[in-house]
Amino acid sequence: MATALHTSDLSGMEVLDLSTYAEFSRRHHRSRDVVREIEALQRLAHVFATDPPKILQELVSISMALCGADSAGISLEESTPTGQTQFRWIATDGAYSPYLGAVLPSLFSPCGTCLSSSAPQLFRVSKLYLDTIGVDAPPVTDGLLIPWQVDQTRGTIWVIAHVACQLFDQEDYRILRSLADFAAIAVRHSAQQEELTQQTAANAALAMANELAHRINNPLQSLMNTVFLASQGGTDAADFARQAVDDTVKLSALVKELLHLRKSY
């Protein structure tokens, strides 16, 4: 039988590898509504096709509903500017809904253990653990963690109970494993859309910069001509000087606009 990587008595966190934890397979299996599962997957496919930004939220909602969980979520692994690794909850539902966007450390965490082993985990965390990491949330009495990865991006999808100690079974694992694949696809799609948006914005900025360059050329040429004429002296020199000031103001405004554009992109 597998042993916990961290005992709940000392740390408040208990994580068990499902591939070696035989007791999980002996848990009582709840009856399932196959039609409900099919309808949920159809709804998921529909959201992905018609409203992609909502796919991650739909994923956790379906995970929670099909597994009978109290909370569900998707964690994304991130790197901080200092090179540290952390997890951001990019989708949450149930009792953990208020913690959308929460950032947790990767060291000494169920998600970190899950990704380090690249294997599904059963986990529990007590109030002691949550207090240690500074999170004011209900403890986890039973939880399933499934890793997912696409290219270099990875994370976990999870369902948790806050009261029952043996809520999840092999069928829940099967369902969550399938949904983990959807999570990976959804995250990759989101990244591709963001990249496309950035590229579109960059192209728009380039076009605007080219337009500004042409607009700058006119007052610049006028300024050069006016300065030349003013330098010749004569009765019109004062008028040419005033015109040079006006051209300089126009040129300065366009340059500021161009500089602002560069800062924005």
Regions found by a protein language model. Name each.
Residues 66, 238-265:
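Conserved DHp (HisKA) dimerization/phosphotransfer helix of two-component histidine kinases, i.e.
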Residues 2-54, 205:
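Signal-transmission linkers at sensory-effector interfaces
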Residues 61-64, 73-102:
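GAF sensory/regulatory domain recognition
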